[in-house]
Amino acid sequence: MGLLSILRKLKSTPDQEVRILLLGLDNAGKTTLLKQLASEDISHITPTQGFNIKSVQSQGFKLNVWDIGGQRKIRPYWRNYFENTDILIYVIDSADRKRFEETGQELAELLDEEKLSGVPVLIFANKQDLLTAAPASEIAEGLNLHTIRDRVWQIQSCSALSGEGVQDGMNWVCKNVSTKKK
Amino acid sequence: MALRRLLLRYFPPGIILEYVEGGESKTRSIDLLDLRPDTDVTALVEEIQKREPLITASCLEHITHLVQRLQEKLGEKQNHKFSLFKVLRTHILPLTNVAFNKSGSRFITGSYDRTCKLWDTASGEELHSLEGHRNVVYAIAFNNPYGDKIATGSFDKTCKVWSTETGKCYHTFRGHSAEIVCLSFNPQSTLLATGSMDTTAKLWDLEKGEEVASLNGHSAEIIALSFNTTGDRIITGSFDHTVAVWDVGTGRLLHTLIGHRGEISSAQFNWDCSLIVTGSMDKTCMLWDAVTGTHIATLAGHSKEVLDVCFDYAGQRIATASADGSARVYNAGTKQCIAKLEGHEDEISKVCFNPKGNCILTASSDKTARLWDAATGHCLQVLEGHADEIFSCAFNYRGDTIITGSKDNSCRIWH
């Protein structure tokens, strides 16, 4: 990818290019989701120390997806990547109930960010392949998603591992990009 | 005018004349850019004497001796094998660019963690962490040859100038309306130039701490800039497919180099300020007359984007790096491709010569940096160990130390 390619992806993109920011706590499955989107091997994924960028074609759009590491010490740097974001995807580990409060708090802070104001948000209730996973409806309620009124949002249950539900989420993304970009 | 003393400059080969004129001490250089180990010294010295009035019969012996020393330096066999000396892991996010000071005693690294760190090359010790930017520190530079100041350009739209000695911030330059992605001190270290995604470049007075010129004219992001050796011209390369040549004194646009059919990736003057080389996403590299701004040649051959280009110190050769995974070496005089550097398994984002010009260093997304023989194109060494893409690399002036900066958050020193 190189630094120059990163600069090219940084500039405000033409109509058919979409900048997607993928955030969430560490171990939520962001990188697995990114690789699933790009149809890449997901058997050896390690915690992201920085970021990963991939471009995928979908429904006539070029989706430039930025997957940013979610460990606590690097979360303050998420704002490095806010500029020109078209869609925010927030990933939650649905089986990690102990951290629902933490993830809810991080999401609430993101929704308060001026640079992300009005940006459509898709919440992936990930890891539905695990038996202990909470259903999307429970997460939506726990996170008070119904109180979000300043933007369009959607919660989608998925398994980044199996790929189930991922495409449904991306369809929502493309639909909401098209209304915003046109 | 009275000659006071003669100094050697190894790279590019030259002799510096220190003399007194009107009570003032001045210097000027005799560039010996074509010098080879087998050049006829007697003939060369005669020619120098004819050309340079300060060189009188009494110092011919001294000049001969200096030329011979330069030849010895050029002829030295370098079989140096590099090995990993240290891994520096105090940045907590990916690195951006890296740079040495002139002597190579210190170097700096920029990072997504919003800091620039200053390091001691010999020990690998962190001397200062320059903190204050509110976003990625992308462009960094020492004011070489002095090295007492460091400039940092950030995605936070500001640029800061720091003291190398204390790590204190002298100035914060505000005025750009988008990310600063390239910067350079002028050779006299009186000005700093910054280039931004806001499509402008600016010149800042380092003493007064204020903007002296805004170079407006590009219609898209500026991603490369470079002063010429004398410091009276600056070029800016833009995503608008053009390179602009500006007069530093007046901030006036002198020429626009039009010809590339894709975004510019890199642009540089050669040492004697006669040529400009440009690399582009259109897969080609172009050579231009720096004085008239006219197109001289197109160096084609790469099958994907050219991501970086550079001259060697003497301006005799050009190296190009491409997304096609190869690098190429061209003769700046004949414009012929002399070597293809093949072996990397992914795109090459940076290329540079060692100061002597016999060796080329490339940094790649395949997580390796490689060393190549500049004349034959043979791969001399593969520097392996980084766990992710290498974004930047640099040689020190002596050519015996290399630093590499990676997306894996580490910087490595190789001896």
Curated annotation (Swiss-Prot), chain A:
Protein topology in the membrane: Peripheral membrane protein
GO BP terms: cilium assembly; Golgi to plasma membrane transport; intraciliary transport; kidney development; mitotic cytokinesis; photoreceptor cell development; protein localization to ciliary membrane; protein transport
Chain positions recorded as GTP binding sites: 24-31, 67-71, 126-129
Keywords: Cell cycle, Cell division, Cell projection, Cytoplasm, Cytoskeleton, Golgi apparatus, GTP-binding, Lipoprotein, Membrane, Myristate, Nucleotide-binding, Nucleus, Protein transport, Transport
Gene3D superfamilies in the record: P-loop containing nucleotide triphosphate hydrolases
Lipidation (N-myristoyl glycine): G2
Domain of life: Eukaryota
Alphabetized SMART domains for the sequence: ARF, SAR
Localization: Golgi apparatus membrane; Cytoplasm, Cytoskeleton, Spindle; Nucleus; Cytoplasm, Cytoskeleton, Microtubule organizing center, Centrosome
Name of a matching Pfam family: Arf
Gene Ontology molecular function terms on file: GDP binding; GTP binding; GTPase activity; magnesium ion binding; microtubule binding
Predominant location: Golgi
Entry annotated with the keyword Transcription: no
SUPFAM superfamilies according to UniProt: P-loop containing nucleoside triphosphate hydrolases (SSF52540)
Gene Ontology CC annotations of this record: axoneme; centrosome; ciliary basal body; cilium; cytoplasmic microtubule; Golgi apparatus; Golgi membrane; midbody
SS bond list: none
PANTHER family: ADP-RIBOSYLATION FACTOR-LIKE PROTEIN 2-RELATED
Stated role: Small GTP-binding protein which cycles between an inactive GDP-bound and an active GTP-bound form, and the rate of cycling is regulated by guanine nucleotide exchange factors (GEF) and GTPase-activating proteins (GAP). Required for normal cytokinesis and cilia signaling. Required for targeting proteins to the ciliary membrane by releasing myristoylated protein from unc119 cargo adapters into the cilium.
Family: Belongs to the small GTPase superfamily. Arf family.
Protein's UniProt name: ADP-ribosylation factor-like protein 3
